Design a protein with these regions (language model features):
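Bilobed "Venus flytrap"/periplasmic-binding protein-like clamshell domains
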Residues: 92-106, 137-139, 156-213, 228, ...
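Acidic, polar ligand-binding/catalytic clefts
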Residues: 112-173
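Extracytoplasmic small-molecule ligand-binding "clamshell" domains
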Residues: 40-133
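Ligand-binding clefts/hinges and TM-proximal coupling segments of bilobed small-molecule sensing domains
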Residues: 44-63, 189-208, 279-311
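Periplasmic-binding protein-like
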Residues: 77, 153-161, 237, 241-279, ...
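C-terminal motif of bacterial Sec signal peptides marking the signal peptidase cleavage site
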Residues: 18-21
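Bacterial signal peptide processing site
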Residues: 23-26
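A ligand-binding cleft/hinge motif common to bilobed small-molecule-binding domains
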Residues: 137-144, 192-193, 223-256
Length: 311
């Protein structure tokens, strides 16, 4: 993990760069009980049938993946609009799911298959259970030491509250509040860092409530159990829409950080194939079109960098 700056608690905005820090996927704080699971309503997936196979890229695909014919993706499917379950509760949908299918199409494979996996378990399963991890992974130096990361999105972070802000949450001073986050995300570590700053300043600590699924947070936030939630800006916007306006963003979006596709560190061949397939999707407008289906096209990057330098 790269060195993080210790921030003053006068303004949250000044601490935004902490969100590039990787959360320790083995650590949780005050785990929340997730007894109610909400499922986002069905969305129209992007039709990948018009995306061609690119022979030069298909030639790079490792033989075992070619033989299988499937690009296996692990994703924590409770983080709409990136990855979540359809109304049937069984079918993964979202822009990351469509991106995996599009990559498979470019690489000449039969399909891209996504299976749900709890967020902290995805990276350890790369190279065995999964070929790729496309699940809103913020690119960090720690993750780049563990796996190869191919950049494709730039996503900020934002606070969300019940509409009207009935708890009077102040994003510039969240001390003494109860904040919901998804387990293993950059936002979980950021909230814990803010809590430490609060205590150091003689203020009340932040009670951080991690959930395995981001979708579990909405009901409890609306019901008044939490003061606020902290998540990717795309997630807050989508959650607001899906809640019928019962959740809203408060404050500005924090500084954006790149997200990447994770591939096993020792699989240079698959890494090259994924990087070039992603660049093809970018160059030909497919990535933007996929994201636009979910209202997230502003997050698209134009260069698929391998293990980019991050602060």
């Amino acid at each position: 993990m790269h060195t993080k700056t210790i921030f003053t608690m006068l303004t949250v905005a000044s601490a935004a760069t902490a969100l590039t820090a990787c959360a320790d996927p083995t650590t949780t704080t005050n785990p929340a009980s997730s007894t109610t699971t909400t499922t986002a309503s069905s969305a129209t997936s992007y039709d990948i049938s018009s995306i061609p196979t690119v022979d030069d890229i298909a030639a790079l695909v490792p033989d075992d993946v070619k033989m299988r014919g499937t690009l296996r993706n692990g994703a924590s499917t409770g983080y709409a609009p990136a990855e979540y379950m359809d109304a049937d509760g069984q079918t993964p949908i979202g822009y990351d799911i469509d991106i995996n299918k599009a990559l498979a199409q470019v690489m000449g494979l039969k399909t891209g298959e996504t299976k749900h996996s709890e967020f902290p378990t995805i990276i350890p399963a790369l190279g065995t259970k999964f070929d790729v991890g496309i699940s809103s992974f913020t690119i960090t130096t720690e993750r780049e030491q563990q796996v190869n990361m191919v950049s494709y999105l730039n996503v900020g972070s934002a606070w969300g509250v019940a509409t009207g802000n009935p708890k009077n949450f102040n994003p510039s001073d969240p001390c003494g509040t109860t904040i919901a986050v998804q387990t293993g995300t950059a936002q979980e570590e950021y909230a814990a860092t803010l809590s430490d700053e609060c205590v150091a300043a003689g203020k009340g600590k932040i009670t951080v409530m991690p959930h395995e699924l981001q979708t579990d947070i909405a009901t409890k936030l609306i019901g008044g159990q939490y003061d606020a939630t902290l998540a990717d800006s795309t997630v807050i916007g989508y959650t607001s829409t899906q809640s019928g306006g019962k959740i809203e963003q408060i404050g500005e979006t924090f500084e954006s950080a790149p997200q990447g596709i994770a591939i096993a560190k020792d699989d240079a061949q698959l890494t090259e194939a994924v990087q070039k397939a992603m660049q093809y999707l970018m160059d030909n407008g497919y990535l933007t079109d996929i994201l636009a289906t979910y209202g997230a096209d502003n997050a698209a990057l134009t260069t698929a960098e391998l293990n980019p330098s991050v602060n």
